[in-house]
Amino acid sequence: MKTIIVFLSLLVLATKFGDANEGVNQEQMKEVIQNEFREDFLNEMAPMSLLQQLEAIESTLLEKEADRNSRQKRCLGENVPCGDFPCCGKLVCQKTFGYGWLYKSPYCVKPSNG
C-alpha cells in the first residue's frame, strides 16, 4: 500500500510540474523546429543547385559527345561508282567513257576543265 501511495504521489508531482513547464517547452520546441527547418531547407537548396549545375554540365557534355560520335556522311573517292552516295571533295559524279560502258553507272571523277 505504501508503494502505491509513493507512486501516485510521484505521478501527481510529475503531472503538476510537467504542465507548468509545458508552455516553455512548446516555445522551445517551436524554435528548435523552425531552426531545423531552416537548416534543412538551406541544406536541401545547396545540393539542388549543385544538382542543377551538374545536369547542365552533363547535358553540354552529352551534346559534344553526340557531335563527336556522329559521322559525317560517307563520300566516295575517285573512280568509284556513284549513285546514292555523294562524291568526296572536288569530285563530280559523271558518266565516263572508261568505266561507264562496262558497268553502266556514273563514276566519281575530277571535273574536266573545258
UniProtKB/Swiss-Prot annotation:
The keyword Metal-binding does not apply. It is found in: Secreted. Disulfide bonds join C75-C88, C82-C93, C87-C108. Residues 1-20 form the signal peptide. GO terms for cellular component: extracellular region. InterPro entries: Toxin_22 (IPR012627). Pfam families: Toxin_22. Residues 21-74 form a propeptide. Ion channel inhibitor. The presence of a 'disulfide through disulfide knot' structurally defines this protein as a knottin. This is U17-barytoxin-Tl1a. It comes from Trittame loki (Brush-footed trapdoor spider).
